[in-house]
Amino acid sequence: MHLKRLLPALLAVILLAVSLPIAASAEVVTVKINGFDCFRNSGNLIVYTEAYGPKTNTNEWGVEAVVGPDNKVVSVGGNDNAIPAGGFVVSGHESDTDGKMRTWIQQNVHVGDYVYYNDRTMLLTVSTEPIDMSAEVFYDAERAFNGVNVTRGENFLVVYTSSKGKTTGTNEFGYEVTVEDGLVVSLGGNDTAIPKNGFVVSAHGSSIDWLKTYVQLGMTASYDASAKTVKFSYNAESLERGMAAILETLPPALEDAKENFMYLQYDVLEQQIAEAKKLFADALAAHRNDGSDREFATVCDVVTDKVAVIRSSISESYTVQYRAVWVRPSQKSAKEVDAYVKELHDAGINTICVEGNFNNGVIMNTPKDCLFQRIKTFNYDVLQAYVDACHKYGMECHLWMAIMEVGHSKGQYYSDNIAYKKPEWLSLNQNGTPHNPDDFMMIDPANDEAREYLVNFYEYIIRNYDIDCFELDYIRYYSRSDLDFGYTEAAFKKFEEQYHYGVTPTYDTKAAYWEDWKKFRMSQVTEMVKAVREMIDRVRPEVLLSADVVATVNGATEYNYQDFVTWLEKDWLDILHPMAYGDGYGDDIRQQVKLAGDQCMIVTGLGVFMAELGATEMVRQAAEDNQNGAYGDCFFEGSAYLKDMAGPALMETVYRNQAISPFLDPNASIKACLDYMKGRIKDVLVPFEGITADEGEKISALIDGLKETVSQGKMDGEKLKELHMALKAISGKKAKAALESDLYRAEQITCVTYRVDQNKLYGELALPKGEPFDPHPAPGPGETSKDEDDEESSKPSEESSQEESTAESTLIDPVDDGGSSTTIIIVLCVAVVLAGAVVVILVLRKK
């Protein structure tokens, strides 16, 4: 917990103001901080202390002020500054849309000034003179609100009472504070339950910042309906009441875990609760005996941290689970990749989703005539280095590819990009241009030629790199707002052929054809998902297919034309990553878990890059994911995960048990799931009388028998059925549910492996395949090898020939056209015989 440098004399004025920088004309200026000891995101102001490390590790797009242990500024300028002992660094980033914090530092902070921060109110204060820090630590915060029980609009602050209904009815784009009996009892979320003896304060936009900055658990709260003001008070009484209330929630939470037979370290948790209660009781006694407010508040902060750890530890810690990060590679050599992968492994990560295309290029070696060329700043095969390093450390390597978003027209090396070479393949907005505010060059999903080329390129990758999963990102249109995309001749033609409106669609949401125009574009994206699924099943069925999607169904379909519900219904995906960056996505994750069933794992994308979240919030969200049925988490992104120290916080709580990824070794994963099930029986169910000792022995023996049959990622059907019958016979519903949940996690793995085997049998026998293209060919006469001249080999060929023109549109044909008809007939006959044999075997097994 950071040292408090509180400014009570200023707080009365500051807390009445909107949380924006105050004009710089005064001798004292104050600004809101975005975070502490975390990744400096776009437009952020971050404070870095010694706890973060020796340096700030920031890039060149900001400026920093170094503050000594006496709170005096010793230097202003640069980035990646050393953090002084006993001092801190204030780091600002510049953004046109998110905040100009570099400019704020340059205008307001000078060598010799005094700087103080308050991590409770998230305020930074700069003064030309030192400020007396001996005053009280408490404060009041008051703000006008927009109304009682009204619809929450943009930047609104609304008070909801029980006369509104059971919940606030708000969407996911806000933040809410619940007040019960005049006391703040919960923070965060949306569509919150409204207590009969209290109210909910609901914020959107800039009002969210105000609530997050000034309101904390335990504060007293009231509102004046006639004046339309809400007031929160932080004082000794509210701190005492709040801490006592928080501590009292822990024993019931632990008791509830016991009743549901959660697999926890109950003796450890009970001891931690007792220690936290004693620490608070001692601090309270000292405060009542003329102790200082500051010392009392500081100890309460320590207790709050301990409570957060305890709460997050009241969560399952599975031994088979995705603990993944997205990574944009920046390493200059395979050796650096190895070191980085190991660092992530040691921080609790078991899967890396490495970005395959950015900076107008790709990270793998490609044929000379390919429309995708390796990023010129890399002189080695980055993808191969990540595959090798991940497998060396027992981690899955997923290739994260942006599908429709292929480049940036204003970026470096744009002339090497597929969008530059094939502008006719780009998606256009209603104005007939491919341009959008993010400068994303997006492929038109309705263009069949483009789709075929992309799928052929992905086949080339899958044939030549031992990736564990192919991940579809930007598998959608550019998000609809003032601009809408998909207005191409290819799309118009196909739309008319399907719907026969006799008009060319325009951006008119009230048009008679609008719903069909949306549906049509969703179908074009869906066709790409289907094509990739079919290609993988034919070429390397053991490769998983995943997709990164908008976290809400409505947001995906209405604004991005992304119909992932259909993809789940068709069983095309093995993993779905809802990008739940922020808070309040619990209902959406539960809905997607239900939609996915046992055929697809939900692995939630969490926004560790967001300064307002931090390690504690990542732990809470990971625990919530467990509760909601997700099969793990994927953090965006790797560097932020490491800088935010999320790893140590997670490994102390939700990730306290080491976990293997599900599909690197499916046999080992299934056995680990079954061992976890046995552990729950031995350590929880029998001791807490969920089942008898005899039942425990019988079920454990059945589990052991099933483990012996695990092979090729599957379990023996008869023994699995026998175990299910034994679980069904358990009389206690909660005990039965706990064990069935464990077995279900093992069965989810088998569902994917059955699909793999099915496609190996019925897909690969269809036609003989040509030799996989070698991305590392031996140099021909007069050519240099890739090792000697990697940069040259990645450049597009400048020769013009009919063969190369054909290659530009088809990349490489994966099928060998040189096979004789006799060979094909023989292979087809063999395929028919084998398929018949498989059907007979399956029928006999069912009998």
Predicted regions and their residues:
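Catalytic domains of carbohydrate-active enzymes, especially glycoside hydrolases
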Residues: E336-V362, N464-D468, L573-L576, G632
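Aromatic-lined substrate-binding rim segments of carbohydrate-active enzymes
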Residues: Y340-V341, F358-E405, W517-V539
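C-terminal low-complexity, Ser/Thr- and acidic/Pro-rich disordered "stalk" regions positioned immediately N-terminal
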Residues: F773-S820
